[in-house]
Amino acid sequence: MKINKLRVAATVALGLGVGAAYAAGTGSAVASSKSVSAKDHDGSSHQRDLPNPYEFLPKVPSFKAYSTTVRDGHALPLAQWSGVFGVPGGKDISPELSWYGFPKGTKSFVVSMYDPEAPTGSGFTHWTVEDIPATTTSLPENAGALDSTTLPAGAIQLDGDAGMPRYIGGAPPAGSGLHYYYITITALNESSTGLPATTSAALLNFEIDSHVIGRATIVCPTEIN
């Protein structure tokens, strides 16, 4: 019965789950064995097969992001993987995040985690929080829990591609190669997007495009064998 539940979880994940390898109990999450060049904490020099998804957007100044939970250029820890999507040991705990050096004129932040390698044709957004006040410069670990009580007042978690207003951990298909998880803090020149929690990540990014004035990114390249 346990195996069947894992198979169902992988199906619900639309190919983002761990697939047959985990259903059989043979899959394992590992750090990249490929050469990955990264400047710690700013995500500015990664080598990857696909273009940086932010390269297609208007250029904005970068600022610094860091974390006591995840490291730029290193795999996601197991706690940041998705038990919801069937990864054994995955806990769907959002990482601790802090940031500094953002542009003057910042009025709010959006925090997100995105996997451009997900086999959907449009990637997969694991987490989005909008309307984070400019006075907030950190989020504690597990701030992305369902019905979180540790997000700052006024912040809103969007439903995300999993259809749940919470952080959903990584769960790439076993054997699909490296997936680069972009954990991004976006600085906006508006205090609120005015968008509800049901807004898709794509629509949010479209609506805030002209309001983005800075961006900080931590990239975690990870694969499941």
Residue ranges and their predicted role:
Residues K2-A10:
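Bacterial N-terminal signal peptides that target proteins for export
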Residues N4, G15-G17, H211:
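Short, flexible coil/linker elements and helix-boundary hinge sites characteristic
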Residues A24-N225:
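N-terminus-centered regions that define maturation/targeting leaders and the start
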